[in-house]
Curated annotation (Swiss-Prot):
Homology family: Belongs to the RNA polymerase beta chain family.
Required cofactor names: Zn(2+)
Gene3D superfamilies linked: 2.40.50.150, 3.90.1070.20, DNA-directed RNA polymerase, subunit 2, domain 6, RNA polymerase alpha subunit dimerisation domain
SS bonds (residue pairs): none
Cofactor comment text: Binds 1 Zn(2+) per subunit.
Biological function: DNA-dependent RNA polymerase (RNAP) catalyzes the transcription of DNA into RNA using the four ribonucleoside triphosphates as substrates. The Rpo2 subunit (Rpo2N and Rpo2C in this organism) is implicated in DNA promoter recognition and in nucleotide binding.
Catalytic activity, reaction form: RNA(n) + a ribonucleoside 5'-triphosphate = RNA(n+1) + diphosphate
GO CC entries: cytoplasm; DNA-directed RNA polymerase complex
EC number, UniProt record: 2.7.7.6
Positions annotated to bind Zn(2+): 547, 550, 565, 568
Protein name per its UniProtKB record: DNA-directed RNA polymerase subunit Rpo2C
InterPro entries with a match to the protein in the record: DNA-dir_RNA_pol_su2 (IPR015712), DNA-dir_RNAP_su2_dom (IPR007120), DNA-dir_RNAP_su2_hyb_sf (IPR037033), RNA_pol_bsu_CS (IPR007121), RNA_pol_Rpb2_4 (IPR007646), RNA_pol_Rpb2_5 (IPR007647), RNA_pol_Rpb2_7 (IPR007641), RNA_pol_RPB2_OB-fold (IPR014724)
Length: 611
């Protein structure tokens, strides 16, 4: 007796079938005729003899053209009607011309890439091979020539690139934003870019790129960049940051007020900080501001009711709650808006702009996951030049190409070179872009070698370089990881309330973490004094009295000028340090002792004289 196939719906066994193949076939016919949801998945596993039907959400599905008897159901007649907007995509799905398959059902499908590759064995054909890529990977040219991790990285970094993010950026008040000054459309384009409208909002610029070493300054993915190109506006962008505050209402009819705080107000800053404020407390347009400057002057009533009763709400007891420029930032006031909240309170918003010219440490990336930072800015006259006098904008390291297998970038550079010579844009769409040899022959027609390599001369000595240099045009993106937003140092600053260690992070004027691995290096070197300085003296030093008899933390009675042990009762005058001596420990260690005590563990310290 033939074994019956189990039928599962969303993983739950509901029935069995004697003829599973016919059941699956009839269900698919019903789906294509619109009787079942187009998002239903119907798959048959011959090995386990199971039918799996999925109708639940969260499954990734993709559209494919149905093939019947060796012919695509998407005929030229239908295509023409779609192009003329007579038919919609939804109509093709409803009539079974196109159907959605998930990963499970795709195991039962034989999918052809192109119509002319269809055989009688095929069940589906791709709408177009380029649909396998999403938005991020689709804008990269020749991705089929790159390794998969680089495509993933390129897709991720494309989201971080600077350009013109939206049409109304002139009046937007986003918390932070970037604007590239001279975005260009890429010379090597893809069909994805046309579909997305990328050319209307480009996010990068075409760089003349040379692949060569330059005095070691482009090691480890660093770039050498042309100073004259930067002065002409290459990679130049503006960073925007918005600040806001509103006049809050308090119980008892009190409220905040936008104004220039008077000197008697609690928390008054230096007079210099208020220098750009108008009488209404709002800053003047085009004022230059730096870290700590007030841009929205505001005062608030006292925080506690007792203060009001004692002072009878005198003006001097109001608090300064002004908004200041963030630590480590500066710029020019770009936009000031005075509006109202939903509750009718006055709302002030200020946008500050800061010009960001590319500098050491700024991050750039091609569309092939080749990311790096600027390692050296070189005057144009010192850079190598070609026989035609072309000086590259960017010099990248030859070691960046072979191990990463980003041949797509090599093809893009040749394509960009051809496009600039022929004053046209080259198609680099996946699987259907202009071929390698077509581009090579085009270069030869213009007198260049088909490899893209050129003879170059040293800008400093004028001597001919011994080997030919690969030169081309590549589209590079400036990423929002700019060194001006990350550079940070601290000598002294605020500490945390709980641990008394320096705060963390650039925004809080924090210290630089000296971690376990850094500690191990000093231990290995035997640098004991340096260890003590980093981990104790410059972090959270704390002096406490410890009972020499029982090892408990002692108590200091300030009024009586005595110290005593709460456990064994030992005591002595403040001048004596024999029974209860002062011990220097890290405050974090003292905190640990206190937390152990809170859990019922009583740690004791054993003391001995210094050697």
């Amino acid at each position: 007796m033939e074994k019956q196939a189990n039928v599962y719906v969303n993983g739950k066994l509901i029935d069995t079938s004697k003829d599973p193949e016919n059941l699956v076939k009839s269900l698919r016919i019903q789906r294509r005729s619109g009787k079942l949801s187009p998002n239903t998945s119907i798959s048959f596993n011959e090995e386990s003899n199971d039918i799996h039907i999925s109708t639940d959400g969260g499954r990734a599905v993709r559209p494919l053209v149905v093939v019947e008897n060796g012919f695509s159901k998407l005929t030229n007649e239908l295509l023409e009607k779609v192009n003329n907007n007579e038919l919609t995509f939804e109509y093709l799905v409803k009539t079974g011309v196109i159907e959605f398959l998930d990963a499970e059902e795709e195991e039962n499908a034989r999918i052809a890439m192109y119509n002319d590759e269809i055989t009688f064995e095929n069940t589906h054909v791709e709408i177009d091979p380029l649909v396998i890529l999403g938005i991020g990977a689709g804008v990269a040219p020749y991705p089929e020539h790159n390794s998969a991790p680089r495509i993933t990285m390129a897709a991720a970094m494309g989201k971080q690139s600077l350009g013109i993010p939206m049409a109304n950026i002139k009046w937007r008040m986003d918390t932070r934003g970037h604007l590239l000054h001279y975005p260009q459309v890429p010379l090597v384009r893809t069909k994805h870019q046309e579909i997305l409208g990328f050319d209307k909002r480009p996010a990068g610029q075409n760089f003349v790129v040379a692949v060569m070493s330059y005095e070691g300054y482009n090691m480890e993915d660093a770039f050498v960049i042309n100073k004259a190109s930067l002065e002409r506006g290459l990679g130049r962008s503006t960073f925007f940051r918005s600040y806001e505050s509103f006049e809050k209402r308090y119980p008892g009819g009190q409220l905040d007020k936008f104004e220039v705080p008077e000197k008697g107000v609690r928390g008054y800053r230096a007079e210099e900080a208020y220098r750009n404020l108008g009488d209404d407390g709002l800053i003047d347009l085009e004022s230059e501001v730096r870290s700590g400057d007030v841009i929205l002057g505001k005062t608030s009533p006292p925080r506690f009711l007792e203060e009001q009763e004692i002072t009878l709400q005198t003006k001097s007891q109001r608090r300064d709650t002004s908004v200041t420029i963030r630590h480590g930032e500066e710029g020019v006031v770009d936009l000031v808006i005075l509006s109202e909240t939903k509750e009718g309170n006055r709302l002030g918003k200020v946008r500050v702009r800061d010009l960001r010219v590319p500098e050491f440490g700024d991050k750039f990336a091609s569309r092939h996951g080749q990311k790096g930072v600027i390692g050296l800015v070189v005057p144009q006259e010192d850079l190598p030049f070609t026989e035609d006098g072309v000086i590259p904008d960017l010099i990248i390291n030859p070691h960046a190409i072979p191990s990463r297998m980003t041949i797509g970038q090599v093809l893009e550079m040749i394509g960009g070179k051809v496009g600039s010579l022929e004053c046209r844009r080259v198609d680099g769409t996946i699987f259907s872009g202009e071929g390698e040899w077509a581009l090579r022959h085009a270069l030869e027609n213009y007198g260049f070698t088909h490899s893209g390599k050129e003879t170059m001369y040293d800008g400093k000595t004028g001597r001919k370089l011994e080997c030919e240099i690969f030169v081309g045009v590549a589209y590079y993106q400036k990423l929002h990881h700019l060194v001006a937003g990350k550079i940070h140092a601290r000598s002294r600053g605020p500490i945390q309330v709980l641990t008394r260690q320096p705060t963390e992070g650039r925004a809080r004027e924090g210290g630089l973490r000296f971690g376990e691995m850094e500690r191990d290096v000093l231990v290995a070197h035997g640098a004991a004094l340096l260890l003590k300085e980093r981990l104790l003296d410059e972090s959270d030093p704390h002096e406490d009295y410890v009972c020499a008899k029982c090892g408990e933390i002692a108590i200091f009675d300030y009024k009586r000028g005595m110290k005593f042990c709460p456990v064994c009762g030992e005591s002595e005058d403040i001048q004596d340090n024999r029974k209860i001596p002062p011990v220097k420990i890290a405050y974090a260690f003292k905190l640990l002792l206190d937390e152990l005590k809170s859990m019922g563990i009583d740690p004791k310290l054993k003391l001995k004289d210094r050697a």
